[in-house]
Each structure stands twice: as structure tokens, then as C-alpha cells.
């Protein structure tokens, strides 16, 4: 899978883009 905003800081999955989830404060 590809995540266009990997490593971006986040507090919840919705802070990331499609196919991304928030893991340990970063999108992945």
C-alpha cells in the first residue's frame, strides 16, 4: 500500500490521507 503522507505528524487517522493510519504519532 502507498501512503502519500507517511511520517507526517498526526493525532488521529483522519489527520492522514487515504490508505494511511495514525501510528505512534505519525502517519503510516
UniProtKB/Swiss-Prot annotation:
The record's subcellular locations are: Secreted
Kindly list the residues the record flags as site (Reactive bond).
Answer: 5-6
Q: Which UniProt keywords apply?
A: Disulfide bond, Knottin, Protease inhibitor, Secreted, Serine protease inhibitor
Q: Which cysteines are joined by disulfide bonds?
A: 3-20, 10-22, 16-27
Which domain of life does the protein's organism represent? Eukaryota
Family indicated by similarity: Belongs to the protease inhibitor I7 (squash-type serine protease inhibitor) family.
Q: What is known of its domains?
A: The presence of a 'disulfide through disulfide knot' structurally defines this protein as a knottin.
Protein task:
Inhibits trypsin.
Q: What is this protein called?
A: Trypsin inhibitor A
Species annotation? Momordica charantia
Please spell out the taxonomic lineage of the organism that makes this protein. Answer: Eukaryota, Viridiplantae, Streptophyta, Embryophyta, Tracheophyta
